[in-house]
């Protein structure tokens, strides 16, 4: 197992950690039943009726699963 020979300084530690960045997800704006929703483009969406009851999951305009 590799073990560092010397203690790493605070500035070097923080400089190394600054490269670990999280990217913001790209959200897609959609309008469903008059409501604006934001979702990830690669996830299935829940299709609801006018009462708000979940009916099924939809992906690329096709039904993929029942809820």
From Swiss-Prot:
One Pfam family named in its UniProt record: Ribosomal_L32p
Database matches in InterPro entries: Ribosomal_bL32, Ribosomal_zn-bd
UniProt-annotated stretches for the region Disordered: 1-21
Top-level taxon: Bacteria
Basic residues composition bias: residue spans: 1-19
GO biological process: translation
Family statement: Belongs to the bacterial ribosomal protein bL32 family.
Official protein name in the record: Large ribosomal subunit protein bL32
Gene it is expressed from: rpmF
